[in-house]
């Protein structure tokens, strides 16, 4: 029987009382041997005696700014269903609040479930789980664990789970009311990712259906008022970080903010003042440039200044490359000053304690989706006031840190107050597919904090219709349901389903993993261009980049099957200018996709890569999902005009066709981005006839008149006319084999 509210309140009061006395005992017994304390106290989470490290970390935790609100927070949690917490970076919010919620659930004997805490970045989720397991004196992967894309480090016994907001959103497809959790914590709300906003909206509904569920929303001070109102005047608990910070502004905007930031960095280093430095740049490309520049300059510096150690912190980098804490320290006698280079999205990844200086260029480059041209543009714009204020919290709380703003103070006053929510500036097709899976019909009436752009919603619905993911009533079709099972872009999911019909599942799973993982090609400086060409040339496939990626993965997998050591595999990657981390990620993704295929009982086929028939089948599968991404070379020089609009793009430098004597006339591309040099990435040659065979007639007829469209109709052979066909495609089976196909596609 569920515990009553009065019983919960009594347990919480006892918990708070016990916590206070425990803390007093630890303080008063500082001279007592650790073994004596261990004999007295048992960890309530695993029943084992506390280690001496637990008490050491407890004293560190008590110094965190967030610790001051612990008992106030627990009291609000006991008496309210939804609690909003306002706290800045490095306050301890992400590590301490989940532990307090675990204590709350422990007091209630886990009657209503465990605790889950979402993070905006997978790196943060992994590191926080490890750190919190250490602080709670329990085992990672047992009492405390994490779930991130393509990695699950939890068991049924886990009482505190860290995960990305995307993973919790996907869990809702099989567990709509999140019934396995007693407390749901949404952290880093200010990032305003699409999955974050979707969770915030759904939790309002779930809270009504589950009165026993507790919801904790953690955000920055600037957004707390909005969230309090959004959740019907929910109680607000504020953790103030009051340490002094000196802000230094420039008199005018620098012409070159990038080099101005580097000059200031070197000036600080020459003063010999102690402390590490964080530099916020506009984009990841600038992080790479700054890293190489600092490495070169450091070689010529006076050794008496101490070593300058740059750390490139990419928000979307691999977990294995991420070192967030004192692990960066070493035992060297020579002083080292760490310089963290990151972007605005890297704020929550910075955990170093000794940061005395922050340099902020005040500019960021954001990817904004343009519905008209179906492409992302890299937009340069000033940061928001929320970002500007949060820079101060990065500085060490024990010092009088300095924040150098490379913009005038009046420029700061003109910044927009909040970050733009991602639901207002990204492609919404994956979100709409999820909402349809959750039986949300009136998309325009979903209660988001910021409403998505109606045009973006309409285009997402239209694209899902073209992909045969919707039936005639606008609900998910059988294909749409299966597509939603994959953690992929719907177009890629559709290509995998088509591969089931064309007997090339093995190759499509490999390709899906390679395009989902980070770029496998390493960026080399211009002087190493020849080495780059030799490395990539071995894997080049004349049909295009999709096939080149399959070649690369197959070679890498062959090394693994031959039981090569990790050193040999990494050396092989280095010799061919490939990223070992990216290929490892692709392998993990492929295994996850293979597990999904088996779980929903989709047909699998063995490898057949290399034959002409297999190449054609792969192209057919790709066209089934990417028929909206076709381009034609207009001048024989690699300038491609898109079929869906009149934008022109060039081949990406990583494309194998860049080094070919002749470029193909018609190509299918994976991605088109608008920037200083608009590029199409991952392209393969196709024939107009093959395209006309697989393009949905109602999509082709809706295309605006153009020369490219006319050429496609003229080049069409008599045996492949664009005749009207049934509205819904059946790529998994032939029309006369319906009964068999239904047995092959089962959602469990």
Curated annotation (Swiss-Prot):
It is found in: Nucleus; Mitochondrion. Its EC number is 3.6.4.13. The keyword Nucleus applies. Residues 74-240 form the Helicase ATP-binding domain. Keywords: ATP-binding, Helicase, Hydrolase, Mitochondrion, Nucleotide-binding, Nucleus. One of its GO terms (cellular component) is mitochondrion. Residues 706-748 are annotated as: Disordered. Belongs to the DEAD box helicase family. DEAH subfamily. This is Putative pre-mRNA-splicing factor ATP-dependent RNA helicase DHX32.
